[in-house]
C-alpha cells in the first residue's frame, strides 16, 4: 500500500513538473495619433514624427490613376538611434521593427483635397505599436 501511494505521488509530481507553462497573453497593439514633430515614449523607446518627405496621395474629389503615397520619417531613439521611413501605400514599407516593437503607419491625416496645400504642422500620423 505504501509503495502504491509513493508511486501515485511520484506520478503526480512528474505530471505537474512536465506541465507546460501557459504562454503569456499577447499585448494588444496600441494605436496612437502623433502630431508632426511630436514624440511619444513606449517601453524605453522614443518615437518622434520627424518629417513628411512626400505626399502624392490622390486628393479627395479628383480621379487619379493610382491612390498615391505619402512617406514619413520617424526618429527612433532608445537602444541606439535609427530613422524609419514609412509609407501609406501598401506597395511600400508600412512597418518597422525596433527594439522588439513593431511600428506601423496606418494613416496620415489630413487627406489632401483638390486645390489645397497641407501645412506640414497639421499632419498627424496614426501609428500602431505592438510588442
Place the predicted regions along the sequence by residue.
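Charged, amphipathic alpha-helical segments
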Residues: 42-62, 101-114
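Short, exposed beta-strand-loop hairpins at the edges of beta-sheets
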Residues: 110-120, 126-128
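C-terminal motif of bacterial Sec signal peptides marking the signal peptidase cleavage site
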Residues: 15-17
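Post-signal peptide N-terminal segment of mature Sec-exported envelope proteins
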Residues: 26-43
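Bacterial signal peptide processing site
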Residues: 19-21
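Sec-dependent N-terminal signal peptides
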Residues: 5-13
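Mature extracytoplasmic domains of secretory-pathway proteins
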Residues: 47, 51-89
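Short Fe-S-cluster ligation motifs
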Residues: 89-107
Amino acid at each position: 500500500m505504501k509503495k502504491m501511494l509513493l508511486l501515485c505521488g511520484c506520478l503526480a509530481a512528474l505530471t505537474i513538473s512536465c506541465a507546460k507553462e501557459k504562454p503569456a497573453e499577447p499585448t494588444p497593439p496600441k494605436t496612437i495619433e502623433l502630431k508632426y514633430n511630436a514624440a511619444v515614449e513606449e517601453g524605453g523607446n522614443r518615437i518622434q514624427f520627424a518629417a513628411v518627405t512626400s505626399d502624392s496621395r490622390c486628393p479627395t474629389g479628383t480621379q487619379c490613376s493610382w491612390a498615391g503615397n505619402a512617406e514619413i520619417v520617424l526618429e527612433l531613439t532608445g537602444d541606439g538611434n535609427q530613422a524609419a521611413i514609412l509609407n501609406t501605400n501598401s506597395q511600400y514599407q508600412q512597418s518597422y521593427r525596433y527594439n522588439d516593437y513593431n511600428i506601423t503607419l496606418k494613416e496620415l491625416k489630413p487627406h489632401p483635397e483638390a486645390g489645397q496645400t497641407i501645412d506640414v504642422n497639421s499632419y498627424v500620423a496614426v501609428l500602431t505599436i505592438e510588442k
